Design a protein with these regions (language model features):
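Phosphate/anion-contacting hairpin/loop surfaces
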Residues: 1-194
């Protein structure tokens, strides 16, 4: 079974802070539902003041936070195809002057996780703080016996800040012509986005 890494690194607006008033930042990196404790009216996230020229808004918004911020178009595709794999927490996006630029964006909180990484064959460095999490990838190898059933969009165990998709999700997102995203083959990935 093949999987791809969902890569939202692009030249558009960049977010560099978790929304205030919601769950603590680290909780967005754990495969758990947060909607019950998330404010019903949503939260606000702002463009990074460190990158004032980055103003373009794509369907996938670049972030240094290891979370996915996506448009309603992305939400619709994912909820139609694999509704149990993620929940969508509403955010209003504001620009560098704190003016609202979009109200139809969401934190795509990936609930599903899968054990797909072959740690023995991969060339990785494990985190000193989170002992079961990979901190650096030189060459990622996936297990050869991954069952075909299971989540289609998920956090790979040991790489919790990343999102992987199966070919059906990749095809659906590509067919929808969503912007600001690319897909990198997970098997053999060298840890770089380019």
């Amino acid at each position: 079974m093949s999987f791809s890494l969902l890569c939202d690194k692009n030249d558009g607006a960049l977010l560099d802070a978790y929304p205030e008033g919601g769950p603590e930042g680290w909780r967005y990196l754990v495969s758990q539902r947060l909607a019950a404790e998330y404010p019903s009216g949503g939260l606000t996230m702002g463009f990074s003041p460190n990158f004032p020229d980055r103003r373009k808004l794509y369907d996938f918004v670049d972030s240094i936070l290891e979370i996915r911020i996506v448009s309603d178009r992305v939400r619709q595709v994912i909820q139609e195809l694999t509704p149990r794999d993620a929940e969508f927490l509403p955010v209003t996006l504001v620009d560098h002057q704190k003016d609202v630029v979009a109200r139809d964006y969401f934190i795509m909180n990936v609930i599903a996780d899968r054990d797909v990484i072959d740690l023995e064959r991969s060339t990785v460095r494990m985190s000193h703080l989170l002992k079961d999490n990979i901190s650096r990838v030189s060459e990622l190898k996936l297990k050869e016996d991954i069952p075909p059933d299971g989540p289609k969009l998920f956090r790979p165990r040991h790489l919790r800040g990343y999102t992987m998709v199966d070919p059906t999700v990749q095809a659906a997102l590509t067919t929808a012509k969503l912007t600001g995203v690319k897909f990198l083959p997970a098997n053999g990935w060298n840890g770089k986005y380019r």
